Each structure stands twice: as C-alpha cells, then as structure tokens.
C-alpha cells in the first residue's frame, strides 16, 4: 500500500502441537492472538506461518519413547509492533520432555510422577492471553497394577483441555480438547468500533 494504514485487525495463529501415542496427552492448540487497531506500514510485512508438530507413533508401554512434538511459532513481522504467537505444546508421554508440553496452549499430560498436570498455556506470557493449559491424565496412574493410563486433552484458545477419567482398570475416557475462540469482525477502533449488521458474528 501507499502510506501507512491504521485501524487494522491482525489475527496470528501458531501451529498446534501433536499428541503422544498409546494413551498419551493430546497436543495443544497454537497460540491465538487477535489485536485490533494496529498501524501497518506502507511496505511489505514479512509473515511466518508456524507448522503443526510432527505426528508420532510407537509401541505401547515403552518408557522414554515418543512424546508429541511442539508446534512452531507464527510471526506477523510488523516493524512497529511484531506479533508472535507461540506454537502449541506437545502431548506428553511417560513424563518425557515435559517442558515441551508448554506453549501457546498446553499439551495434555500422560500420567507420570513428574508430570501430573498438563502443559501450561500462554507460554511465554502475553496480554491478552494466547491460550490455555492442557488437561491432566487420570490421577491414579497405573494403579491398581495392570490398569492403564489415559491422556488429558490439549488446551484450546478458548478453554483448558479436559482431564482424563479412568473409571476402572480397563475403562475410561480421555480428556476433551479445549474449545477454540470466536473471531469477531470489527472495523475501526475504540471507543466505538463498527461491528456490521451481524454484530460481529459470522
């Protein structure tokens, strides 16, 4: 464009994390950042679109193997105000690479003494928040002996991931993924943005 543009709304969404196999946690959603009233320069703006975390597979009950993978960051490179959304956290598997569970939204956990909770969301922290934490695995782990673990759901832009629920040594439900976030159409800036005839819903 010729000259700067003011009052722009910019949505930046990062790549989501991948889930872990064999009862592991679900991957977290990529960071979600919607900023209104941005001023854009009259020049090309570099944009990086983050990829989702690579999928994984592996044999059952193999300690130390195959956690999920984090998603990659997305960047809107406005020189006046660069906006980065963090990749989603990986689903964890047997407590391996627990820090990879943190991200834009956190990955769900697979029970392990060092990772009882899902990964943190809004990591690194920004305001407004770019995501939510992942859900927990079933709290009792592999108790009684012979039972199995079930992963928590990955966090979403609009809600935390659900916790898993083990109802018997051989039955249960994994945690649901967290909800996404609605996006409204806004034109102009506060205090009186124009939402259009549908009140910003489409």
Residue ranges and their predicted role:
Residues 1-202:
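Glycine-biased low-complexity/repetitive sequence motifs
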């Amino acid at each position: 464009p010729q000259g700067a543009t003011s009052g722009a709304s910019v949505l930046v969404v990062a790549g989501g994390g991948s889930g872990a196999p064999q009862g592991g946690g679900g991957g977290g959603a990529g960071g979600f950042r919607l900023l209104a009233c941005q001023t854009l320069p009259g020049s090309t703006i570099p944009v990086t679109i983050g990829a989702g975390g690579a999928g994984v597979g592996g044999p059952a009950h193999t300690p130390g193997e195959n956690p999920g993978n984090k998603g990659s960051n997305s960047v809107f490179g406005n020189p006046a105000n660069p906006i980065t959304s963090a990749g989603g956290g990986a689903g964890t598997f047997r407590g391996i690479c627990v820090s990879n569970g943190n991200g834009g939204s956190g990955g769900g956990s697979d029970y392990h003494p060092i990772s009882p909770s899902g990964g943190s969301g809004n990591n690194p922290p920004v305001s407004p928040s770019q995501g939510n934490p992942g859900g927990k695995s079933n709290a009792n782990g592999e108790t009684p002996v012979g039972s199995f673990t079930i992963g928590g759901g990955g966090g979403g832009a609009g809600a935390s991931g659900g916790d898993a629920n083990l109802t018997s040594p051989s039955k249960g439900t994994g945690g649901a993924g967290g909800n996404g976030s609605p996006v409204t159409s806004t034109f102009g800036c506060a205090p009186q943005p124009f939402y259009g005839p549908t009140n910003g819903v489409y």
